[in-house]
Amino acid sequence: MLILTRRVGETLMVGDEVTVTVLGVKGNQVRIGVNAPKEVSVHREEIYMRIQAEKNGQLAGHDSSSSDEDN
């Protein structure tokens, strides 16, 4: 894991097209802004994990329903 130190208003680059800017720090919370092309998905980790779980559930549900139709 790369660990960087940034101050409010400072930016880091991820590749050529994604920027992450520190917008503010209040207590133990850090506000960041992410600027990325539309084709790059940006999610909080808990949202990403929920999306993945839903995809896996839908795929599993779809597979079982299609096999039921074949019987």
Swiss-Prot record:
Domain of life: Bacteria
Main location: cytoplasm
Gene Ontology biological process: mRNA catabolic process; negative regulation of translational initiation; positive regulation of translational initiation; regulation of carbohydrate metabolic process
GO MF entry, a single one: mRNA 5'-UTR binding
Keywords from the UniProt entry: Activator, Cytoplasm, Repressor, RNA-binding, Translation regulation
Any one annotated GO CC term: cytosol
Compartmental location: Cytoplasm
InterPro entries: CsrA, CsrA_sf
NCBIfam families associated with the record: csrA, PRK01712.1
Sequence similarity: Belongs to the CsrA/RsmA family.
Cited function: A key translational regulator that binds mRNA to regulate translation initiation and/or mRNA stability. Mediates global changes in gene expression, shifting from rapid growth to stress survival by linking envelope stress, the stringent response and the catabolite repression systems. Usually binds in the 5'-UTR; binding at or near the Shine-Dalgarno sequence prevents ribosome-binding, repressing translation, binding elsewhere in the 5'-UTR can activate translation and/or stabilize the mRNA. Its function is antagonized by small RNA(s).
HAMAP family tied to this protein: CsrA
Subunit structure: Homodimer; the beta-strands of each monomer intercalate to form a hydrophobic core, while the alpha-helices form wings that extend away from the core.
Name this polypeptide is given: Translational regulator CsrA
Gene transcribed to yield this protein: csrA
